[in-house]
From Swiss-Prot:
Keywords: Bacterial flagellum, Periplasm. GO terms for cellular component: periplasmic flagellum. Belongs to the bacterial flagellin family. It comes from Spirochaeta aurantia. Component of the core of the flagella. The flagellum consists of an outer layer composed of repeating units of FlaA around a core that contains one or all of five antigenically related polypeptides. This is Flagellar filament 33 kDa core protein.
Length: 20
């Protein structure tokens, strides 16, 4: 579960970086 949460955070960051 913790790993899943971490993956979600990394995914969101990558998407945000791409948008910027």
């Amino acid at each position: 579960m913790i790993i899943n949460h971490n993956m979600s955070a990394i995914n969101a960051q990558x998407v945000q970086g791409b948008v910027t």
